[in-house]
Swiss-Prot record:
Classification of source organism: Bacteria, Pseudomonadati, Pseudomonadota, Alphaproteobacteria, Hyphomicrobiales
Gene Ontology biological process: amino acid transport
Keywords: Amino-acid transport, Signal, Transport
Residues in the signal sequence: 1-23
Name this polypeptide is given: Leu/Ile/Val-binding protein homolog 2
Entry-linked CDD domains: PBP1_ABC_LIVBP-like
Highest taxon, organism lineage: Bacteria
PANTHER family, alphabetized: AMINO ACID BINDING PROTEIN (PTHR47151:SF2), LEU/ILE/VAL-BINDING ABC TRANSPORTER SUBUNIT (PTHR47151)
Length: 371
């Protein structure tokens, strides 16, 4: 990210938080703020900002106000490493981020070596916490749990059909596809096709022709919404009438913008929608009053800040290592996702994944609704 852009965004953050002092706690927000996955970055940014505003109004972390600085990783591991090094150089000690597993895993090593605690709102690859670094936490669920749900669902509902498992060759996408494949196989069904495509590809006509020739009746996609939307639309255009199923990488209304009416009936796994929790009604209204729909990772980022602040206050310290210990030992912490405790690895206690289906809501717009 260009220095001028970074400084400009930081200045906006300082103004938004009402100024800063040398005693303020600097929290970095690492996310894809530009590029094809910027919709998720915006969710994270909005969630963090709202949670920090609430925390600061209540006294911050042990009486110290929180100041936000931003790092645009553009969903790219190399850019993410640059962001991490920039955060370290600026004296950031806590990070809400990153989003993509392929960014969070390499940056976590940099943060661990430099005393920075990170809470990832969207990193679902099991490897992120399986290494048991002292500083890695997440407020989202894991792909091994997500794959179990998706694989069993397909084995139960398409056992007489043929399944294609596709992925985008990223740590998140291929990792999720592999976990889903494992579950599908363990539930007595073998996939007909297993193929990877490149993130950023736009023409899937050859792959769709191959799936038509193979008689595919269900397609599982391990990847993000930009490619998913194109796949869904092109499948419809080429007459492939197969059920499309994916994971939490497609939970953005941009999916419907890309896929059009072909998005109707698409299914995906995700955690129960926090927008359905009446306890969040006031917060949801506040977002909507500002013209922002708080989708998906808005709440996971918000919960990350809540967990951080509550753990620091419980520890009576803003030292990252002491806060990390408190996160594992002082829970549960009250959040917009419900009460969360963290295990020794940094994984949260959350309800299981569920299935969602895309259809038109009362407003006439496509959205994902729990089945």
């Amino acid at each position: 990210m260009k220095k001028s852009l970074f400084c400009g965004v930081c200045l906006c953050a300082l103004v938004a938080m009402g100024g800063t002092s040398f005693a303020d706690i600097m929290v970095g927000v690492g996310a894809p703020l530009t590029g094809s996955q910027a919709a998720f970055g915006e969710q994270i940014k909005r969630g963090v900002e709202a949670a920090v505003a609430e925390a600061n109004a209540k006294g911050g972390m042990n009486g110290e106000q929180i100041t936000l600085v931003y790092g645009d990783d553009a969903a790219d591991s190399k850019q993410g490493i640059s962001v991490a090094n920039k955060f370290v150089g600026d004296g950031v000690k806590f990070v809400i981020g990153h989003f993509n597993s392929g960014v969070s895993i390499p940056t976590s090593d940099i943060y661990a070596e430099n005393g920075v605690l990170m809470i990832a709102p969207g990193t679902t690859n099991p490897t992120f916490t399986e290494r048991e670094l002292w500083n890695t936490f997440r407020t989202c669920r894991r792909d091994d749990k997500q794959g179990i749900v998706a694989g069993k669902y397909m084995a139960d509902n398409y056992k007489d059909g043929k399944v294609a498992i596709l992925h985008d060759k990223t740590p998140y996408g291929q990792g999720l596809a592999d976990e889903t494949k494992k579950s599908l196989n363990e539930n007595g069904m073998k996939e007909t096709l297993y193929e990877g495509v490149n993130q950023g590809d736009k023409d899937f006509s050859a792959l769709i022709s191959k799936m038509k020739a193979a008689g595919i009746t269900a397609v599982y996609w391990g990847g993000m919404h930009p490619e998913a939307g194109l796949l869904i639309r092109q499948m419809a255009d080429q007459g492939l009438k197969a059920q499309f199923i994916s994971g939490d990488g497609i939970v953005s209304n941009e999916l419907a913008s890309i896929a059009g009416d072909a998005v109707a009936g698409v299914m995906n796994t995700f955690g129960p929608d926090p927008r359905d929790d009446k306890a969040n009604a006031e917060l949801i209204k506040a977002f909507r009053d500002k013209g922002f729909e708080p989708e998906a990772y808005t709440f996971y980022a918000y919960a990350g800040v809540q967990s951080l602040v509550n753990a620091a206050n419980a520890a009576g310290s803003n030292d990252p290592m002491e806060v990390a210990t408190a996160m594992k030992e002082k829970g549960p912490f009250k959040t917009v996702l419900g009460d969360i405790s963290f295990d020794a690895k940094g994984d949260p206690s959350l309800s299981p994944y569920v299935m969602f289906e895309w259809r038109k809501g009362e407003d006439g717009k496509y959205n994902y609704f729990q089945k």
